[in-house]
């Protein structure tokens, strides 16, 4: 048997990229795990996920042959992670892709060459088998020509790839035979390549994307056929390194060794503990990379995924005897393992560790809170005469507090109870179905638009320097089809051979303006990039009939453009000020640059304080008032990075980039339009700062005249306040503080008076106390202003009556407030304030509850308050 090459994970990755680069492929950088332009995805979950724009025809790539190593996250099988050899939440997918270029034959032959050639991976061909779709005769023939025996070419009906609407097609897979040690039972019906077994490991998958699926079962041939190939790095590492699981490769073992060092336990000595080692190693990779790409733990979306993963790892760490925050200590190890291809984890290690440590500390506190909730749930069940914790409650504890089912089961057993595990599984299945439906809905690609894809005629953009240009309409479209004319009032799309109109990009909105022909006028409503990179104008024919091939004059609306450029340059200054004030972890997470305002979304852990906002605003204005020259250069991307240019989070750049510098203060890669000097911006004013999601903040601001109007509005408000307060504008804060002091004194006097009145009324209520079967009972409607006053009166009565059951109610408008008290000696006799108040409240249209000694409730029907209070006597008699 041919020996295996002992390649490291880094060598396997680099060899894959080098091989396909030698076959004319362009290397596509690994995209951020946080999707930038795809709201349908929670995470980038495959190598092809970042290339959908190429496959559905929205964008034509410069090179139709692409290769990448894409970091990915999938969490749909999280419960299997650590328990199987190959389930992961974070993994790398190596892929080679053809967008309308080579197809089946080259894809298969190149895959075989890379896998079997001694120059590359050098696998033994005798240990490889393939699967194909039963109707894919072309693939079968190619495999036979490569020397694969017919008995190792297995037809499988499942070899057809589709994810809803869009491109689809048959696929072929390559399997590696790990040997009889992983399965040698001739009676095992699953022991074949493609079956459920451990012996035959899938290492390669090629999708022949040749159909468009309309989502209704109809398939049509794609005008341009595509190739989508995937090879999992972790799986391939387990093959080349000849180890039983992915976790035993050099991609995981350094993390496991570090965990051994922290825990004092040894990997591979106890099967149950091995699961814990694997879970921790997997989850820290996911969390470290995701935080490095801008995601932060939270209670929603991708932030919730991170929170669950961290909490799951912490729970498994308890099996290893680790009872303190420790995951953050593994970040440096993750960074060192992956640094060859992913430098961002080491670069952001301090921030990543701070976030993880904070989350771990919070979870250790949450565990105590969860136990308190679990105790309440169990007690409530017992109070209702039940000895089972419902599946819904168990799942809520799991989903909200990170409590595993087994922990809830252990607790229940300690309290002579059980858990509805079937109900828990049903709740879990429902959540998975919802998640699966969301993935299927969001994973599909758009159908190819052949009309736009075939528009390859060049168009020159002159808008960086000119706001007007004489041009020619080189393509005119109406309802998606090429036409020769479009009538007045109709909407159309067109290309110009020369255009001053900027196409929406990088958050900067498109220019507006007019296009004037010999006998027609067009209003430009929008400009977007066409698949082949030209600026595609959406217009409405204001007058006349728009004609293809007509000579026209294109004019950008100057005042709007001027305002947009001010706001765009201001976003660059804001980005720099944010990093200077909050930290280098700040990354742009989205932006909108319009004529009216700018909006800047950025990653940050926690709210921005008023002091920090003031510093940020001041720094931006200082840069504006410094009259910094804004210079624009085109250079090699390596030179740009050496110059210190900020590459925007999630963006992909070619070899030549456009660098926008505002003096030495701000240097960014940007294709947008800017002022020539920061002084043109005039003034910068932040109007709002808020959180918009997990670890993402948003600042909205205005510049120039917009900033003046905002500040003038603030001044007018201040002057109006001064008039109302009858003081000078400079003395408004002091006057307000004085009024607040007066108000607090008045409130204290009011509260004191209320307390005295309550005491007087409480004293008079003693005459209304009833004796029922030897128990003092007081149930009375009283006249107080709010719940606080009602509780104060209750405290007075409890003190004076001693052993008693008291229920007080008050009505304010259409609202009822209720409080109940049961003294300790009567609790021992079976009386319960929470149960009593619940019954009283239901009789006046409300609800509530509480402890055995004290409870409160509300109602919505004041007319029934006295009737409800009368129930108290019945309650006492029923338990006598």
From Swiss-Prot:
Root EC class: ligase
Reactions this protein catalyses: tRNA(Ala) + L-alanine + ATP = L-alanyl-tRNA(Ala) + AMP + diphosphate
Keyword Iron-sulfur: no
Cellular component per GO, a single term: cytosol
GO BP: alanyl-tRNA aminoacylation
GO molecular function: alanine-tRNA ligase activity; aminoacyl-tRNA deacylase activity; ATP binding; catalytic activity, acting on a protein; transferase activity; tRNA binding; zinc ion binding
Localization of this protein: Cytoplasm
Cofactor(s) essential for the protein: Zn(2+)
EC number: 6.1.1.7
Binding annotation for Zn(2+): 568, 572, 670, 674
Cofactor note: Binds 1 zinc ion per subunit.
Role noted for this protein: Catalyzes the attachment of alanine to tRNA(Ala) in a two-step reaction: alanine is first activated by ATP to form Ala-AMP and then transferred to the acceptor end of tRNA(Ala). Also edits incorrectly charged Ser-tRNA(Ala) and Gly-tRNA(Ala) via its editing domain.
Domain comment in the entry: Consists of three domains; the N-terminal catalytic domain, the editing domain and the C-terminal C-Ala domain. The editing domain removes incorrectly charged amino acids, while the C-Ala domain, along with tRNA(Ala), serves as a bridge to cooperatively bring together the editing and aminoacylation centers thus stimulating deacylation of misacylated tRNAs.
Similarity-based family: Belongs to the class-II aminoacyl-tRNA synthetase family.
Protein's name in the database: Alanine--tRNA ligase
């Amino acid at each position: 048997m041919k020996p295996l090459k002992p390649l490291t994970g880094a060598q396997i990755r680099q060899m894959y990229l080098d091989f396909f680069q030698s076959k004319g492929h362009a290397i596509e950088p690994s995209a951020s795990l946080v999707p930038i332009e795809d709201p349908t995805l929670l995470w980038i979950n495959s190598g092809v996920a970042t290339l959908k724009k190429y496959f559905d025809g929205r964008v034509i790539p410069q090179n139709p042959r692409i290769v990448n190593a894409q970091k990915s996250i999938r969490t749909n099988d999280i419960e299997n992670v650590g328990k199987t050899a190959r389930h992961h939440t974070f993994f790398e997918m190596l892929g080679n892709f053809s967008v309308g270029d080579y197809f089946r034959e080259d894809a298969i032959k190149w895959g075989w060459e890379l896998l079997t050639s001694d120059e590359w991976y050098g696998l033994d061909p005798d240990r490889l088998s393939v699967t194909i779709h039963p109707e894919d005769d072309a693939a079968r023939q190619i495999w036979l020509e490569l020397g694969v025996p017919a008995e190792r070419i297995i037809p499988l009906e499942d070899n057809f790839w589709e994810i809803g609407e869009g491109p689809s097609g048959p696929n072929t897979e390559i399997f590696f035979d790990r040997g009889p040690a992983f399965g040698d039972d001739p009676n095992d019906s699953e022991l074949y390549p493609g079956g459920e077994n451990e012996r035959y490991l899938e290492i390669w998958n090629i999708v022949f994307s040749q159909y468009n699926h309309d989502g209704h079962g109809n398939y049509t041939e794609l005008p341009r056929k595509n190739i989508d190939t995937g090879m999992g790095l972790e799986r391939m590492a387990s093959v080349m390194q000849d180890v039983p699981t992915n976790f035993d490769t050099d991609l995981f073992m350094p993390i496991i060794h570090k965990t051994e060092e922290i825990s004092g336990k040894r990997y591979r000595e106890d099967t149950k503990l091995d699961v814990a080692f694997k879970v921790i190693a997997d989850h820290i990779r996911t969390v470290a990379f995701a935080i490095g790409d801008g995601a932060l733990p939270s209670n929603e979306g991708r932030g919730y995924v991170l929170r669950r993963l961290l909490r799951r790892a912490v729970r498994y760490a308890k099996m290893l005897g680790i009872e303190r925050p420790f995951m953050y200590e593994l970040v440096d190890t993750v960074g060192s393992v992956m640094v060859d291809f992913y430098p961002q984890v080491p670069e952001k290690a301090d921030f990543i560790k701070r976030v993880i440590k904070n989350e771990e500390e919070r979870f250790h506190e949450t565990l105590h809170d969860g136990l308190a909730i679990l105790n309440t749930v169990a007690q409530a069940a017992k109070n209702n005469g039940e000895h089972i914790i419902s599946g819904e409650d168990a799942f809520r504890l799991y989903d909200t507090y990170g409590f595993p089912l087994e922990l809830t089961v252990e607790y229940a057993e300690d309290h002579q109870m059980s858990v509805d595990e079937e109900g828990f599984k049903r709740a879990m299945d429902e959540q998975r179905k919802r998640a699966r439906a969301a993935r299927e809905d969001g994973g599909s690609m758009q159908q190819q638009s052949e009309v736009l894809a075939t528009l390859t005629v060049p168009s020159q953009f002159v808008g960086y320097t000119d706001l007007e240009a004489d041009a020619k309409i080189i393509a005119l479209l109406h309802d998606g089809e090429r036409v020769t004319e479009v009538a007045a009032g109709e909407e159309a799309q067109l290309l110009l051979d020369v255009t001053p109109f900027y196409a929406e990009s990088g958050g900067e909105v498109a220019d507006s303006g007019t296009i004037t022909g010999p006998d027609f006028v067009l209003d430009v409503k929008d400009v977007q990039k066409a698949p082949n990179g030209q600026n595609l104008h959406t217009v409405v024919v204001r007058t006349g009939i728009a004609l293809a091939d007509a000579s026209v004059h294109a004019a950008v609306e100057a005042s709007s453009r001027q305002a947009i450029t001010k706001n765009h340059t201001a976003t660059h200054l804001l980005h720099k000020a944010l990093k200077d004030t909050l930290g280098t972890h700040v990354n742009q997470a989205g932006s909108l640059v319009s004529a009216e305002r700018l909006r800047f979304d950025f990653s940050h852990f926690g709210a921005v304080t008023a002091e920090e906002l003031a510093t940020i605003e001041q720094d931006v204005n200082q840069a504006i008032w410094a009259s910094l020259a804004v210079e624009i250069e085109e250079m090699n991307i390596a030179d740009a990075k050496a110059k210190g240019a900020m590459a925007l989070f999630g963006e992909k750049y070619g070899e030549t980039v456009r660098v926008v510098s505002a003096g030495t203060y701000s240097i960014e890669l940007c294709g947008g339009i800017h002022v020539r000097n920061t002084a043109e911006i005039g003034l910068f004013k932040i109007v709002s700062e808020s959180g918009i999601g997990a670890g993402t903040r948003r600042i909205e601001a205005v510049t120039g005249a917009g900033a003046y109007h905002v500040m003038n509005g603030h001044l007018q408000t201040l002057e109006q306040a001064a008039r109302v307060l009858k003081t000078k504008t400079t003395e408004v804060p002091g006057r307000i503080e004085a009024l607040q002091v007066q108000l607090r004194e008045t409130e204290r006097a009011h509260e004191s008076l209320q307390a005295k009145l309550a005491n007087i009324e409480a004293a008079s209520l003693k005459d209304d106390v009833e004796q029922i079967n030897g128990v003092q009972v007081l149930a009375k409607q009283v006249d107080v202003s709010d719940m606080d006053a009602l509780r104060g009166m209750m405290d007075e009565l409890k003190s004076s009556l001693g052993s008693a059951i008291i229920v007080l109610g008050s009505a304010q408008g259409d609202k009822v407030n209720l409080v109940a008290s049961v003294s300790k000696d009567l609790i021992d006799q079976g009386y319960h304030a929470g149960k009593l108040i619940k019954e009283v409240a239901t009789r006046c249209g409300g609800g509530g509850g509480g402890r055995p000694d004290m409870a409160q409730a509300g109602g919505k029907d004041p007319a029934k308050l006295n009737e409800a209070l009368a129930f108290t006597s019945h309650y006492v008699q029923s338990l006598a």
